[in-house]
From Swiss-Prot:
One of its GO terms (biological process) is regulation of mRNA processing. This is Nuclear cap-binding protein subunit 1. Component of the cap-binding complex (CBC), which binds cotranscriptionally to the 5'-cap of pre-mRNAs and is involved in various processes such as pre-mRNA splicing, translation regulation, nonsense-mediated mRNA decay, RNA-mediated gene silencing (RNAi) by microRNAs (miRNAs) and mRNA export. The CBC complex is involved in mRNA export from the nucleus, leading to the recruitment of the mRNA export machinery to the 5'-end of mRNA and to mRNA export in a 5' to 3' direction through the nuclear pore. Residues 1-26, 664-695 are annotated as: Disordered. It comes from Salmo salar (Atlantic salmon). InterPro entries: ARM-type_fold, CBP80, MIF4G-like_typ-1, MIF4G-like_typ-2, MIF4G-like_typ-3. Belongs to the NCBP1 family. SMART domains: MIF4G. The gene is ncbp1. One of its GO terms (cellular component) is nucleus. It is found in: Nucleus; Cytoplasm. Residues 641-719 form a coiled coil. Residues 678-695 have a biased composition (Acidic residues). Residues 28-240 form the MIF4G domain. GO terms for molecular function: mRNA binding; RNA cap binding.
């Protein structure tokens, strides 16, 4: 069917004439297209399109009522940016067909209950807001909406429920008031005052332990980093003070007031929020990201204040556009730039602030990080005359505020910035950042510039970075990524193992077998063994050094050469690292030879884990070891650690999935056996054999899951134990020397601890009891314990 016709917004009459000759499925597709695309570009006004579409749908109700109901319920949930367009459409249909209006309201309430039970809280929020706007369209009676809100707010009186549950229901009420507050206040002012007083009381007694963990900046100037409910409540208070006058929401139903006010209204059925269950996963609290105010956009329209409800509405709509179109960057960018009412606001500033707000959202952004990079690149292409300047202004602001920026967000900023530069020939006014050269190397600004250049080098090559950066920045340019092979120079021939290294190199070049190479390696003296020691050889660090340095030296040409070398000599590497000390030492050797090439270190460690030459706990122990202390605050170290944790988590999930699938298969077989119980005996015997095999498989998988979970728990114990030891030593040392403990290193370390909790919160929650009993006890220094308490508060 032609898609071109669907874009005609004013073809109501024509489509009705053609409908009789169409197939039912084709008509249903056409109805869906007409509904989904109403309000998009058209030669006619939105009002005439809505009136025409209402006429088409009314005529189709006798045959396609259920389909129309399903589509309208779906768009209420999936296209929140067009909410008022669809509420007006439903209002027009209700005015023409009262029974349909009632059925739609019932269907929406059913859908709301289902989404809440399924933990789909964002969808539920859109449905609540849609129901609210139906009050404006004279579909739902205002008193029944107030009654629903009262039931929502009553959740704050429940005992023994997580705070995040009450938070969601309060947020659902407050975030709907910009749309419906005026109507409800006019009809039920006493009840609305009482409702807001109850919310006020709840917000005053609400715990906010979690806030420091979620703030992008620790400083409150120039913009306070407010908790999301506090900020929204302040916006609603100002809206109420302004007599609920809001000027930014598109309200197409006003044009149909004379028709809609004649319609009969429906009462919402009594709505009781579903009870709290242990498996409920409520949305985490947030902190509202602020980067700009009216002083940053001096020309053009004025940016609404942070406590103006217009700011909330604009940001909410922009978030909704990103949520609806994030998989298609071109569409997403075009939709953002064609935002309704764009001439009344400094749109570019709002878009940039919203995008960075999502990118820096803690614990994790709503979408993958690279999406925001590609979206900003697309926006720069579409608005080359204005958006790049706003983006540069934002980058400069973030650079200036690096000292108080959360380390997790600095990671995301440098990833975005380096990727962005790589798409624009690495052009940047580096001289504007010359102030960082006068600071200590461990301060956030020089550290940020150095890490950005390191990341840029990954996306190009060393000489390119040398060429693009002013000579004054030479101290921050990454080192040339060369390989350090200590057995290369004949001047080092006196080194222990030198002769064997030469022999191993020749053996590898001559395609010697693993056995032959192991025979050559037997000549390597063991520095850990006394001359008169008659026992077995044990752990020999020199043997690992001689073999691995030589192997990686011969394979140093590229990543793929190195991967092939590790794969080819996997058996030897496994033999050399059969103990924990061996695993640690192989990691040390990888770092020693490639210390000027962090990316190579990262990918080789990744390969060693994948091929099970080293385990995840060994990587954690190595990263926290004294030999890596000087690298502890480097970006790539944390890249390796988080990658290691993710691998462990995926491994556990994979085995758990296999176990669940085996259990499901057994259940299906047993169910089938019960159904076919009248069949022959030999079939029964085969079935029993299959059941027995599956039961054995389930038992084996159960053991594997328990073993993997034990490894996973041990990995987190190792990581948190090392953090506690390092931070405690630092705090004691500072207290003993009477110096301020709050150094750049301390800020980095404590925020890296927060990062572990935030990035892996779902997994860590399984082991809270163990962590509390063994590590995060009451005796722990309160600075460290505070991080754990903030984490616990995220889901309380």
């Amino acid at each position: 069917m032609s898609r071109r016709r669907h874009s005609d917004g004013d073809d109501g009459g024509q489509s009705h004439k053609r409908r009789r000759t169409s197939e039912p499925v084709e008509i249903e597709d056409r109805l869906e297209s007409l509904i989904c695309r109403v309000g998009e570009k058209s030669t006619s006004s939105l009002e005439s399109n809505l009136e025409g579409l209402a006429g088409v749908l009314e005529a189709d109700l006798p045959n396609y009522k259920n389909k129309i109901l399903r589509i309208l319920c779906a768009v209420a949930r999936l296209l929140p940016e067009k909410l008022t367009v669809y509420t007006t459409l439903v209002g027009l249909l209700n005015a023409r067909n009262y029974n349909f209006g009632g059925e739609f309201v019932e269907a929406m309430i059913r859908q709301l209950k289902e989404t809440l039970k399924a933990n789909l809280y964002t969808d539920a929020l859109y449905l609540v807001r849609f129901l609210c706007d139906l009050v404006n369209c004279h579909v739902i009676a205002a008193p029944s909406m107030v009654a629903m809100f009262e039931n929502f707010v009553s959740v704050t009186q429940e005992e023994d429920v997580p705070q995040v549950r009450s938070d969601w229901f309060v947020y659902a009420v407050l975030s709907s008031l910009p749309w419906v507050g005026k109507e409800l206040d006019e009809k039920k002012d006493v009840e609305m005052d009482r409702l807001l007083n109850q919310i006020d009381g709840y917000l005053k007694r609400r715990l906010k332990t979690h806030v420091p963990m979620l703030q992008v900046w620790t400083a409150e100037k120039p913009h306070p980093q407010e908790e999301y409910l506090d900020c929204l409540y302040a916006q609603i208070q100002k809206l109420k003070k302004d007599r609920w006058q809001e000027r930014h929401i598109l309200r197409p139903y006003i044009a149909f007031d004379s028709v809609l006010c004649e319609a009969l209204q429906h009462n919402l059925p009594p709505f009781t929020p579903p009870a709290h269950m242990p498996d409920c996963q409520y949305p985490m609290p947030r902190v509202i990201f602020r980067m700009f105010d009216y002083t940053d956009a001096p020309e053009g329209p004025v940016m609404p204040g942070s406590h103006s409800v217009e700011r909330f509405v604009i940001e909410d709509n922009l978030h909704n556009i990103i949520k609806s179109h994030w998989k298609e960057r071109k569409t997403c960018a075009a939709q953002l730039l064609s935002y309704p009412g764009k001439n009344k606001i400094p749109l570019n500033y709002h878009i940039v602030e919203v995008i960075f707000g999502e990118l820096f959202q803690l614990p994790c952004p709503p979408h993958i990080d690279v999406m925001y990079t590609t979206l900003l690149i697309e926006l720069c292409k579409l608005q080359p005359g204005s958006l790049p300047q706003v983006l540069a202004q934002a980058t400069e602001m973030m650079y200036v505020r690096l000292d108080t920026m959360n380390t997790i967000c600095i990671d995301r900023l440098l990833n975005w910035f380096s990727h962005h530069l790589s798409n624009f020939q690495f052009r940047w006014s580096w001289d504007d950042w010359v102030d960082c050269l006068a600071l200590d190397a461990d301060k956030p600004k020089p550290k940020f510039v150095k890490e950005v250049l390191e990341k840029c080098m990954r996306l190009s090559y060393h000489q390119r970075i040398v060429d693009i950066v002013p000579p004054t920045f030479s101290g921050l340019i990454p080192a040339d990524p060369i390989f350090f092979y200590k057995y290369q120079d004949e001047a080092n021939s006196a080194l222990p193992g030198y002769a064997v290294a030469i022999a191993v190199g020749n053996a590898i070049k001559n395609r010697a077998s693993n056995e032959e190479i192991l025979t050559v390696l037997k000549d390597v003296p063991n520095p850990n063994q006394e001359d008169d020691d008659d026992e077995g050889e044990g752990f020999n660090p020199l043997k690992i050094e001689v073999f691995l340095q030589t192997l990686l030296h011969l394979a140093a040409k590229s990543f793929s050469h190195s991967f092939s070398a590790l794969a080819k000599f996997h058996e030897i590497l496994k033999a050399l690292t059969d103990c924990d000390e061996g695993k640690l030492h192989i990691l040390r050797v990888v770092y020693e030879v490639w210390k000027n090439h962090p990316q190579m270190v990262s990918v080789l460690v990744d390969k060693l884990i994948r091929t099970q030459i080293v385990d995840c706990a060994a990587v954690a122990n190595w990263l926290f070891s004294p030999s890596m202390a000087h690298e502890f605050t480097r970006f790539y170290v944390w890249e390796i650690l988080h990658s290691t944790i993710r691998k462990m988590n995926k491994h556990v999930q994979k085995i758990q999935k296999e176990l669940e699938e085996a259990k499901d298969k057994l259940e299906r077989q047993q169910h089938k056996k019960q159904k076919d119980s009248g069949d022959e005996e030999d079939m029964e015997k085969n079935s029993e054999d299959e059941d027995g095999q599956l039961e054995e498989q389930i038992e084996r998988l159960q053991e594997k899951v328990e073993s993997a979970q034990s490894e996973q728990k041990n990995l987190f114990l190792v990581i948190f134990q090392r953090f506690i030891m390092m931070l405690t030593e630092h705090l004691v040392r500072c207290e003993t020397g009477s110096v301020d403990f709050s150094t750049p290193w301390y800020k980095n370390c404590i925020e890296r601890l927060q990062q572990i909790f935030l990035m892996h919160h779902v997994t860590i929650q399984q082991y809270m009891g163990t962590l509390e009993n063994l590590l995060f006890t009451a005796e722990l220094d309160h600075h460290i314990l505070a991080v754990y308490q903030q984490f616990c508060a995220l889901q309380l």
